Amino acid sequence: MREILHIQGGQCGNQIGAKFWEVVCDEHGIDPTGRYTGTSDLQLERVNVYYNEASCGRFVPRAVLMDLEPGTMDSVRTGPYGQIFRPDNFVFGQSGAGNNWAKGHYTEGAELIDSVLDVVRKEAENCDCLQGFQVCHSLGGGTGSGMGTLLISKIREEYPDRMMLTFSVFPSPKVSDTVVEPYNATLSVHQLVENADECMVLDNEALYDICFRTLKLTTPSFGDLNHLISATMSGVTCCLRFPGQLNSDLRKLAVNLIPFPRLHFFMVGFAPLTSRGSQQYRALTVPELTQQMWDAKNMMCAADPRHGRYLTASAMFRGKMSTKEVDEQMINVQNKNSSYFVEWIPNNVKSSVCDIPPTGLSMASTFVGNSTSIQEMFRRVSEQFTAMFRRKAFLHWYTGEGMDEMEFTEAESNMNDLVSEYQQYQDATADEEGEYEDEDQEAEDDM
């Protein structure tokens, strides 16, 4: 019941995805060959959210892996859990997208997309009651951004009533991997605004900061960053996979977090994050978790929630704890920091409690917030985009693949609209509505 189909695209998506499957296999007690070696019946009760059970009793992830070059796929295949995936579900080209969104979306990616969709259909038909799709990709490259958004829009056409959740890695403010990131990211956001239901916004710089500051790692690797992301990914869906007192699923999350359809870009966080050395001294209590979870330093994207206001937020707790205490802490947070929540959405924090904590912890929590400060991310990308687009720098790579400058202009204005919508709701107050009604009344009186 309630299956989720996982799709990973491009180098970044495949590396995050590989780490994610390590975490989920660990939680469900499944070893690298797909056999169950766990100890608790709860691990198997709803294992079918993420796994198919094959005839020989092996568990096979409902995962589709795609890329336009074979490199990353090969390393996933030779990695610790490489043998667990269905071999047919690796779909890859040979040419690569060369960090070019147009190649991923219109030329190279478009040639490969049908074989990816075949695999997606096959997996979807295996599902009893498909809840939705989760897509891992980055927005800075070519495949994850270009082909990723192409796949999302195709799936949207075919399964319009299923949830579409993305874990999107945005270009970082200070660290740039490629020059054309702002182009690729803007073109992708243009697609995500229209076709995705929920986007979890991540970026490497914020993740590096968490590794430096909180985890005290001197030289964090991408593996460390991806581990943080996968902890959050597993937290978002833990309620579907394990019994809980207050359940949430992808659709409940969306209903509670999205006040206006276009504003579905969320900040995510995870607690407890402790450095390896100091773990044993740390008392895990609900107040501790809550405090760290709402901490600005804990957000996995480079936007500071203190610069905006929360429209809505959701806290997912895992472990044995009293629901009363969870509710008290949530109310407490809202009362103490009331200026950081919009007052025209009362009770805008949803909490859920799942009984089974992640491996190695007694309790944990995942935070998902819809904050207007996320506009900082878009604004930054937009400034970089404009600087290059004004000079038409690097455009020939895109027009050469058949794109039109008009598309760039559209994407740019769509992103700027998004920024101003966030700004508008950040400034809105509860009593404005009343003023408009008075004006309407006066207008009628004049008539």
UniProtKB/Swiss-Prot annotation:
GO terms for biological process: microtubule-based process. It comes from the Eukaryota. The keyword Magnesium applies. GTP binds at Q11, E69, S138, G142, T143, G144, N204, N226. GO terms for cellular component: cytoplasm; microtubule. Residues 419-447 are annotated as: Disordered. Residues 429-447 have a biased composition (Acidic residues). It is found in: Cytoplasm, Cytoskeleton. SUPFAM superfamilies: Tubulin C-terminal domain-like, Tubulin nucleotide-binding domain-like. Keywords: Cytoplasm, Cytoskeleton, GTP-binding, Magnesium, Metal-binding, Microtubule, Nucleotide-binding. Its cofactor is Mg(2+). Mg(2+) binds at E69. PANTHER family: TUBULIN. This is Tubulin beta chain.
